[in-house]
Design a protein with these regions (language model features):
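N-terminal targeting signals for export/organelle localization
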Residues: 1-30, 167
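A short beta-strand-turn-helix
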Residues: 33-54, 77-80
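Conserved redox-active cysteine motifs that mediate thiol-disulfide chemistry
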Residues: 50, 58-75
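Active-site acidic short loop of glycosyltransferases
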Residues: 50-52, 82, 110-111, 128
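Hydrophobic beta-strand anchors of alpha/beta hydrolase catalytic cores
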Residues: 55-56, 87
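Structural microenvironment flanking redox-active thiols in thiol-disulfide oxidoreductases
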Residues: 67-108, 118-125
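Thiol/disulfide oxidoreductase modules built on the thioredoxin-like
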Residues: 103-111, 116-167
Length: 167
């Protein structure tokens, strides 16, 4: 069935394919809403932050580049605390353990809101195939940038954060 859809869609120029048929999420499209528990078991939805720019970082405690970039995310979280920018770390808990997440955050003084993707549903919805993966989402809920891999330096996080705030 997938092959037939590809054959049918390949007859049209890319810009004429209806947005509903394009695999999402991607730059220029709305970020899919989700609801996940945080470390205190409180349910958090992306839509709770509609109207604010959001940086979503998918990570795991066993991932070396994830661990290397987490201090930059923590520093950015502290620097932008007075703004409407939201920085959220989504742990790929289906590939990690809550105990490892808690140990990592306590050991490294991480205070960024951490959501637990225990089933992997949100990671699949966001097409996360490599960790870390970071989505930069505008105030209107549109994906502005996606960076796969890391570690991201603080300087790049600042550039992206400032762009989201000014947008």
């Amino acid at each position: 069935m997938t092959g037939l859809a590809w054959i049918w869609l390949s007859r049209f120029p890319v810009d004429s394919i209806p947005a509903s048929l394009v695999e999402a999420p991607q730059v220029g499209f709305s970020a899919p809403d989700f609801t996940l528990p945080d470390l205190d078991s409180q349910e958090i939805s992306l839509s709770d932050y509609r109207g604010s720019p959001v940086i979503l970082n998918f990570w795991a405690s066993w991932c070396p580049p994830c661990k290397a970039e987490m201090p930059a995310f923590q520093k950015a979280f502290q620097e932008y605390a007075g703004s409407d920018l939201q920085i959220i770390a989504i742990n790929a808990t289906n590939q990690d353990s809550i105990a490892a997440v808690l140990s990592f955050t306590e050991e490294h003084g991480i205070t960024i809101p951490i959501l637990l993707d225990q089933t992997g549903f949100v990671s699949k919805e966001y097409l996360v195939h490599s960790l870390p993966t970071t989505y930069f989402i505008g105030k209107d809920g549109t994906i502005k940038e996606v960076i796969i891999g890391g570690p991201l330096p603080l300087s790049l996080l600042r550039i992206q954060a400032n762009g989201l705030i000014m947008d």
